Swiss-Prot record:
Higher taxonomy: Bacteria, Bacillati, Cyanobacteriota, Cyanophyceae, Synechococcales
Keywords of the record: Cytoplasm, RNA-binding
Protein function: Required for rescue of stalled ribosomes mediated by trans-translation. Binds to transfer-messenger RNA (tmRNA), required for stable association of tmRNA with ribosomes. tmRNA and SmpB together mimic tRNA shape, replacing the anticodon stem-loop with SmpB. tmRNA is encoded by the ssrA gene; the 2 termini fold to resemble tRNA(Ala) and it encodes a 'tag peptide', a short internal open reading frame. During trans-translation Ala-aminoacylated tmRNA acts like a tRNA, entering the A-site of stalled ribosomes, displacing the stalled mRNA.
Source organism: Synechococcus sp. (strain JA-3-3Ab)
Family classification: Belongs to the SmpB family.
GO molecular function (one): RNA binding
Domain of life: Bacteria
Protein name as annotated: SsrA-binding protein
Any one of the GO CC terms: cytosol
Transmembrane segments: none
InterPro entries membership: SmpB (IPR023620), SsrA-bd_prot (IPR000037), SsrA-bd_prot_CS (IPR020081)
Cross-referenced Gene3D superfamilies: 2.40.280.10
Amino acid sequence: MAVDPNVKTLVENRRARFEYEILETYEAGIQLTGTEVKSIRAGKANLQDAFALFRDGEAWLHNLHVAPHGTASKVFNHDPTRRRKLLLHRREIDRLRGLVEQKGLTVVPLRLVLNRGWIKAHLGVARGKKLHDKRQAIKERETRREIQRELKGR
């Protein structure tokens, strides 16, 4: 996959790939206020516990923590953990809702990116990993590191 020079990663959910097995990815816009945009551009957001839910034919992002902007007054600042609307096409919402309801999967944000001036969320359709799957992933990562160390040492 080629790297797009117009896309800059602002915040990444590094824990998601460890906690979940990512099956599919989607890109969605997010409905934000001005102070939220300023905070996210500054990297002051946390995707750790965030997830998407579907209600009334709309997709909503819950538990995305966006820190209040420092220079804005309390009156004009936003609620840090409010739910935010995800902007997806109808067929994408229907497909994601079907996957979540039928197969017991979940939708988690993987990262927030700045794409040509717009903040987008990369969403992953995910299945939770069991403890032994996580241990297996750690073992594989360690063996890859050791092999790379050996090759580098030669």
